[in-house]
Amino acid sequence: VQQGWVEVSLDGQPFDKCTDSSAEYDPEGLRLLVQGQEWPWCEKAYILLHKPAGTECSQKPSAYPSVYTLLPAPLRQRPTKNAIQGVQAVGRLDQDTTGLLLLSDDGQFIHRMTSPKKHVPKVYEVTTKHPVDARQILKLLEGVVLDDDPTAVKAAGAEFIGSHQLKLTLLEGKYHQVKRMLAAVGNRVEQLHRSQIGALELPESLK
């Protein structure tokens, strides 16, 4: 907006350049041009981000920069009807985990994507410290018991990629789940990357 890239048209009137980032418009009859291309107006924001390592999915990080600092200020400060302003992370990734992170200010969307009852698959590419073998793959598929829950947790999919790599699909989102599941089968996660949530994958332009 401040660069003069945005033009606004209301109720069929000619487009007029907007340079005020705090300007408010009635969405009824609103049309937008950004650098000459028409953009649809969206009431809610949906962001697909490639989270780098060394960032926290928190508005108040404890030891590493917040992933929210990667976003433009208008998205961080986007007004909402809730007490919290701006978009929120749809689930979280550990600070050392990279990959697909969704952010939105649509509460219903966040609930649909994170509710355990919805069984939204999440795909992780795992690099391990020790070689991956068929026994470990089988155990992950059959289920392993984590230290805080007597109920076995199963991987929805476990695919061997290389001697120290596998692709793991989970339907839950427990705390440090991938790392704890690999530890339960006698291995250790060295690198962790989330490549997919449901049908959404990281596009090549963000890899």
Region annotations inferred by a language model:
Residues 2-207:
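Basic, flexible Lys/Arg- and Gly-enriched helix-loop patches that mediate nucleic-acid binding at interfaces
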